[in-house]
Structure formats: C-alpha cells, structure tokens
Amino acid sequence: MVQTHHIVSGHSGNESDITLRPDTFSAAYASTPIEPDDHQFLVPEMKHLITWADVDAEEASNIAKGRAWLIAQHFTLDDLFDTLTLRTIHQRMFGKVWTWAGSVRRRETSIGIDPSQIQTQFEQLVQNFRWRAANADEIGFSEEERRELGIRFHTELVAIHAFVNGNGRHARLVANLVDSAMGLGSLADPLYPWGARSGLPSAESRKL
C-alpha cells in the first residue's frame, strides 16, 4: 500500500472571498488579470503571476510533476478509495500554485454539494467504492462493470465538488488511476483517454 505521508496542509486566508473560476479555457479568459480575491491564494512563489494564462501554464507544469509522482506510487484500490489519498493527489496537482490545494472546500458554490456535507459524503463515497472493490468477486462484477468503475467514481467525485477548483482534472486523473489499479490501462496509456488523447480540443477536454 502506498504511503501518503505527503500530508496536505490547510490554506490561509478567507476562502469565502475566493471567486471560483471554471475548469474551462478561452483566449479572452486567459488574458484576464487575476482578481485580488483569487491572487491572495497563490503560494508565495507564484505571487508574480498576473493573468490566468500565467496560472494555466503553472498549473500545467504542476500537474505534469504530480503525474510523474503518481506514476511512481503504484496505488492500489484501497489507496485510492481513501479521502487522505484523494486530498494528497489534489495537493500534488495544484500545491505549487495554490494554497488551497488538497483542502476541502468551505464555501457554498453553484456547483457541488453544501460544504457542511462534504466531509460526510466524501467519506461515504470512498467507503462505498472500497466495499465494491473488496466484494467484486462476490457481487459478480462483469467485465463491463469493472471497466466502468473508474468512470462511476469520477462522476460521483465531481458531483461532490470537494475542492475549491480543479475538481474535474483531479477526478479524471483519479479515474485513470482506478483503472490502472485494476490492470486496465495506465496513466501513460489510459483505458479512457481524456484531453488530447480523446481527440477533443484542450478547451473542450477541460469541461469533461
């Protein structure tokens, strides 16, 4: 079992002041200056960033490094169906850019559940899927059900919207890790490709 000792840290500041941005991309949006309410949550090393294009570039670099770390971990399903692991993955993906990386959302948004319910539903989600994985043989999982497990986990994880941002990208990566843990593809050659591997433009892939 992988050791998730790279524990996430809480963020500073008032999260209620964050202006959530969508996981989508456009040229007009990219050139928009980062608003002060968002800028305050950049890590000290990123305070020099000015536009969302700058942020997108740094996030892409951070995610690439996070993927490299994830590939080396060899996660099991028990590892992945664990809230600490999921928070650690999010922190690895965004922690070099944002102070809120890996921290559970504490404000209400138009997307996702009420923040007061996140911890409970987050834990219920991983317990449910951990049970499914442990009892797959007894339940009689078909090959199709095995191939859909990662996608189903992705769907329910996105619905909770546990983090301030990056939920879609995080859930897609976790879905690939779930498939990989079952011997169905890998991060390098995923069972269900997202983004460029799926044939979609980058702008559309970030909406998935």
Sequence positions of predicted segments:
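FIC/Doc superfamily catalytic core
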Residues: 1-208
